[in-house]
Amino acid sequence: MASAPNANGDAAVSDYDLMLKLAQNLDRHMIFPLLEFSAGQLVDEESGVVRDEAKAREITQAKYSLLKNSNMTDYVANLYCELAGVEEPPAEFADKKQKVFSQLQNLEQQTSKIIELLEREDVVNNLRSDKVANLEFLKREHQVTMDMVNALFDLGNLQYSCGNYGDASEMLYRFRVLSTDNDKVAFATWGRLACEILTMNWESAMEELVKVRETIDTKLSQNPLAQLQHRTALTHWALFPLFNFEKAREPILELFFNAGYINTIQANCPWILRYLAVAVITNRGRAKNPGIHQKQMKDVVRIVKQEAYEYQDPITRFVHALAIDFDFEEAQRQLVLAEEVLRSDFFLLAHADDFVDSARHLIFESYCKIHARISLKDLSARLGLNADAAEKWIVNLIRDTRLDAKIDYKEGTVVMNHPPSSVYQQVIEKTKGGFFRTQVLTAAIAK
């Protein structure tokens, strides 16, 4: 669970930092951008001065520990010099660099023939969807060996370890086209997903994400523990496209609300609720199907309520206060804290303003459902705005959403038009609901 509140009832923003929890489920190369973000948070925007030298050094040490076993030799050597206060790194760094260079040369020689073949149109035109047949064709006509194919895999891994993600992606793709080793193919697919994320090639990342999901669902169906672990990892990796690529929003939300993944979140990583709640709340007005968005919002509320004993932060507490407790004062208080948390979160910083605006819409909608006449002064307090800003915000909302409401400037109120629902209309709505449920039951019995 998130840190307990302090004496004033609030926890410090740093207490809601999810870095350690996220890092446990990310590849080391994916953790690096999060550390870079944390380092950037310590720099004063106006002066460029680092506010906390001790914390900055701690982050530099974390970068070094993270990457020292990678093959990013030059960068790791620079980190060492920064930490040790020296100008030249020890000879071991140069030795490792030479060793890595030799490995790259060796693997490039081993793969040069097969790469050349895969770039020839006459060869590619003879390849089919049957990998076994493709290998037989290449062995027979071009003397390709399995060692050559596996060398593509090794070269892709080495390029990745060096931080050459584009080259690594290409090698792993070529390997996957030819290999019949299911375990290595699965590993290569995860590798390509990582590469596409790190190069911010979001469309390709989404294609690889779908492939990884299919592998988890099919290949691991008889191994529940492994399936849980892989789904946990994929859930964390999916945060990168979710908050950086607009077209990824709906398919990834569909993934997260899939029974297998929502169970994974609840059982293994409840902190993902922060990201799920933000994604759903900020999706208002964007969702292609408003009905699906409403269902997702209800599901978020339900899960936040169920998992309150396991995980809480200002974002989930905002949802709880507004949609479960109907405590508007607490919702506004948590919204202020939530904005601070979002601005210190790697994935959510760019969505902080959008979240606050969407959250205010939710507060306004909820408040209007139970009041016919609302004081502008009272509403401005609920929204966390001054009187003028609140009035402007409400005017824009009424105009943009065609809300059936008007502002009474003389009385300083917002007047809501809640047309009474006739008994006849209520009976019709209930009959429709009963008829639909009967259809669902009939269909279920027929199956």
From Swiss-Prot:
Keyword terms of this UniProt record: Cytoplasm, Initiation factor, Protein biosynthesis
The keyword Cytoplasm appears for this protein? yes
Could you tell me the superkingdom of the organism this chain comes from?
Eukaryota
Q: Which GO terms describe its molecular function?
A: translation initiation factor activity
- CDD domains recorded: eIF3E
Gene Ontology CC annotations of this record: eukaryotic 43S preinitiation complex; eukaryotic 48S preinitiation complex; eukaryotic translation initiation factor 3 complex, eIF3e
> Cellular location of this protein?
Cytoplasm
Ranges where the PCI domain occurs: 253-421
- A Pfam match is PCI
For this chain's UniProt record, which GO biological process terms are given? formation of cytoplasmic translation initiation complex
Coarse class of the primary localization is cytoplasm
PANTHER family linked:
EUKARYOTIC TRANSLATION INITIATION FACTOR 3 SUBUNIT E
Q: How does it assemble?
A: Component of the eukaryotic translation initiation factor 3 (eIF-3) complex.
- HAMAP family membership: eIF3e (MF_03004)
Q: Give the similarity note.
A: Belongs to the eIF-3 subunit E family.
Described purpose of this protein according to its UniProt entry: Component of the eukaryotic translation initiation factor 3 (eIF-3) complex, which is involved in protein synthesis of a specialized repertoire of mRNAs and, together with other initiation factors, stimulates binding of mRNA and methionyl-tRNAi to the 40S ribosome. The eIF-3 complex specifically targets and initiates translation of a subset of mRNAs involved in cell proliferation.
According to UniProt, the name of this protein is Eukaryotic translation initiation factor 3 subunit E
Give the organism, scientific name: Chaetomium globosum (strain ATCC 6205 / CBS 148.51 / DSM 1962 / NBRC 6347 / NRRL 1970) (Soil fungus)
Q: Which gene encodes it?
A: INT6
